[in-house]
Amino acid sequence: MQAQQSTVDPSEIAKFEAMAAEWWDPNGKFKPLHMLNPCRLDYITSQIAGEFDRDLKTDAPFAGLRILDIGCGGGLLSEPMARLGAEVVGADAAEGNLPVARIHAEQSGLEIDYRHTTAEAMAEAGEQFDVVLNMEVVEHVADPLSYLTATQQLLKSGGLQICSTINRNPKSYAMAIFGAEVVMRWLPRGTHEWSKFITPDELFALLEQAGLNPVDRKGFVFNPILWKWSISDRDLSVNYVTASTKS
């Protein structure tokens, strides 16, 4: 069998390597993710609970589930999943992120298997998971379809993938690039490339081509007056998230 070619974009990896030490600083370069994280977690936990019939009010509701956090960064999603009882593997192509993630997990008393690897390498090795968290990654890869095919292969039959990214339209450029990188300086300039953003319809089509069954999509909407994020059923104009299952 021919080895799968990695979809990792070296220039994208270099951007995150340069910021690695700041992952757990809520006022640092990853401030946007810290602000967004409660919404991401609300969506992720509700989707997993619904798909696997888990009661979030119980202790360790995700016990027995194997979860992959691909593009895990410093572990902002891996750690909450571990606290909910899941067996968590955090994978990242940016090796500099992982010492930060490992140290923070150890300090937090959590056991998380952090690996410097790619989705393609894990799929080729035959790794299988109940859930794949694919959050804010697809807009940074060189070939989205090949990448999503690899993440599909990592899912067990009946598994669930949560995938979030950024829409491509004038509003997303104004907010995610000009607003976040130029005006607010939440992120270094060049963190995102507008041409790599993906519309919800494009992402649904890619997920289907990759062998997944898209079942839900929601928007993450920032309110500059309340200075907080919320989940929207209708507004997918900038940040949005999807849920897909594997038959």
Curated annotation (Swiss-Prot):
Q: Does the keyword Transferase apply?
A: yes
According to the UniProt entry, what is the EC number of this protein?
Answer: 2.1.1.222, 2.1.1.64
Record keywords, A-Z: Methyltransferase, S-adenosyl-L-methionine, Transferase, Ubiquinone biosynthesis
The entry marks the following residues as binding S-adenosyl-L-methionine, namely: 40, 71, 92, 135
Q: Which GO terms describe its biological process?
A: methylation
| Pfam families from the UniProt entry | Methyltransf_23
| UniProt pathway annotation | Cofactor biosynthesis; ubiquinone biosynthesis
Alphabetical list of InterPro entries matching this protein? SAM-dependent_MTases_sf, UbiG_MeTrfase
Reactions it catalyzes: a 3-demethylubiquinol + S-adenosyl-L-methionine = a ubiquinol + S-adenosyl-L-homocysteine + H(+); a 3-(all-trans-polyprenyl)benzene-1,2-diol + S-adenosyl-L-methionine = a 2-methoxy-6-(all-trans-polyprenyl)phenol + S-adenosyl-L-homocysteine + H(+)
This entry's Gene Ontology molecular function terms read: 2-polyprenyl-6-hydroxyphenol methylase activity; 3-demethylubiquinol 3-O-methyltransferase activity; polyprenyldihydroxybenzoate methyltransferase activity
Per the entry, what this protein does is:
O-methyltransferase that catalyzes the 2 O-methylation steps in the ubiquinone biosynthetic pathway.
Q: Which family does it belong to?
A: Belongs to the methyltransferase superfamily. UbiG/COQ3 family.
Indicate what this protein is called per its UniProt record. Answer: Ubiquinone biosynthesis O-methyltransferase
- Native organism is Ruegeria sp. (strain TM1040)
Source taxonomy: Bacteria, Pseudomonadati, Pseudomonadota, Alphaproteobacteria, Rhodobacterales
